[in-house]
Each structure stands twice: as C-alpha cells, then as structure tokens.
C-alpha cells in the first residue's frame, strides 16, 4: 500500500519520499499545523537503530542539527518524526573541488556549520560516528544541517566485540580498527571532506589527504592526523580555526 497520503502520529500526513538509505526511507510530511516535517521509516529488523537515534537525537537543540521530535509507527514499522532540513546532500550540492572555485565561501560555510553541529553533539557527551556527505544537507548559500543519528552514541562506548562504525571512505583509523570512538573520530571525517574540497577526489582508504598549497593546509593536517592522540578533537576550536583561515565572519 502506498505510504503517501497516510496520516501518522498526531495528524502528520506523509506527502512524498525524500530518499532511501540502507535500512530506512525518509518521507516529506506536513503536521496538523501545516509545518513541514520529515518521517524516517525503518525496516522492521532495524528497530534498534530507531531506538538509538531517538535516544541520541531527542534532546538535541541546535540550528545545524535535525531534531528528533518523537517516535511514531507507520504500518507497524518503527519510525521517527523529525524536523525538516532543507538542502541537498553534500556531494549533490557541490561540484568537484569546491574549495578552489567560486563555491569556496559556501563550501567552507558548510564545514563551519558541520563543526558547530558536532560541537553541540560532543558537548552532550555524544559522537555522530558517521560523518559523510549523505548525512549533510547543504543549501545554495552553504548553510548546512547534520542528520542521521542511528549510529550515534556516547563517546568511548564499548561493544562486546570490535565494531567498525561509519562509512569506509570517511572512517578514522581507530574506527577501521573497531576501537571506541571520540570527538576526534568525527573530526577526521570533517578533515576528509575538507581534503575533498581542496583536491576534488577522495584518496586511498586510510591515507590522509596531502597538502594542497592552500592556507587551509595546517587545519587539514590537524584534522586528519592518523594518531588520534595528536589529532584535533575540539570542534569549536576547529570551527574558529576554519573561519579565521577562510576569512569568514560567522
């Protein structure tokens, strides 16, 4: 049965699908007051992911983070009611090497907003654990929102066996080893995105991006140091460094 047109929760009407991930589909929706919303509907056997995203995202309140409003059910499947984030996923929004084109200002603003969102998350003792282009929605002016918390959890969280969390191209070395992750692990992903913006391509897995003969090189190196004990792990400091090097006022 088509989901579009169905009403879930307290008067939230599903309108159209926005996108699909490996274990969920997201619908654009409108609540009873006419406000745009998103509803993330999980495959039935991924109920634990829905629970994790609810636990991590429900208390977050930052303009650059999508908010998890409540748990709902769609045809018996676990689902979450979210604030609606505008924009396109990062790799769809930007063409090759945006940090070296007329898009530089917008792209660096996207990264600054991402760092602001991560700073709020880290301040609550949480790590995102899947910083990647598909989880960053960017608008035409560069404004950005970080989404998807179904892999998120407490910093330093341990599991019964080594667990590799995240997406390979953006994983920190410690994530590939299955170690507990911290704020510096999220910032490694930001560094990979900065490197992509400067070089126009993702390098070999596990190899930090090389210098780009750009004023942003020192920040790039600090974010992608393979040794997590030396890597920059303070999102607020990284954001201020980025803004200073980029000459951005915000």
Regions found by a protein language model. Name each.
Residues 186:
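Conserved catalytic-loop aspartate of Hanks-type protein kinases
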Residues 110-111:
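Activation segment signature within eukaryotic-like protein kinase domains
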Residues 46-59:
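AlphaC helix of the eukaryotic protein kinase fold
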Residues 71:
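Activation-segment/catalytic-loop signature of the eukaryotic protein kinase fold
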Residues 122-138:
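Catalytic-loop of the protein kinase fold
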Residues 23-25, 30-48:
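ATP-binding glycine-rich loop module of kinase domains
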Residues 75-89:
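Conserved short submotifs of the Hanks-type protein kinase catalytic core
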Residues 90-102:
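AlphaC helix of the protein kinase catalytic domain
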């Amino acid at each position: 049965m088509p989901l579009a047109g169905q009403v879930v929760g307290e008067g939230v009407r599903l309108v159209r699908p926005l996108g699909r991930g490996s274990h969920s589909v997201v619908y654009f929706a409108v609540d009873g007051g006419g406000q745009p919303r998103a509803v993330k509907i999980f495959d039935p056997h991924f109920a634990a992911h829905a629970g994790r995203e609810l636990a991590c995202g429900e208390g977050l309140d930052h303009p650059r983070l999508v908010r998890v409003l409540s748990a709902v059910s769609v045809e018996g499947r676990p689902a979450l009611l979210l604030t609606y984030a505008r924009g396109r996923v990062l790799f769809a929004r930007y063409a090759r090497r945006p940090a070296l084109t007329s898009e530089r200002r917008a792209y660096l603003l996207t990264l600054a907003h991402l760092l602001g969102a991560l700073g709020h998350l880290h301040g609550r003792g949480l790590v995102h654990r899947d910083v990647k282009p598909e989880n960053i929605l960017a608008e035409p002016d560069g404004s950005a929102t970080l989404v998807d918390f179904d892999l998120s959890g407490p910093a330093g969280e341990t599991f019964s066996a080594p667990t590799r969390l995240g997406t390979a191209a953006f994983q920190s070395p410690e994530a590939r080893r299955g170690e507990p992750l911290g704020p510096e692990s999220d910032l490694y992903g930001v560094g990979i995105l900065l490197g992509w913006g400067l070089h126009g391509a993702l390098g070999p897995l596990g190899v930090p991006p090389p210098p780009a003969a750009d004023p942003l090189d020192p920040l790039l190196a600090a974010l992608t140091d393979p040794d997590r004990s030396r890597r920059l792990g303070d999102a607020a400091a990284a954001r201020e460094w980025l803004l200073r090097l980029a000459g951005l006022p915000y």
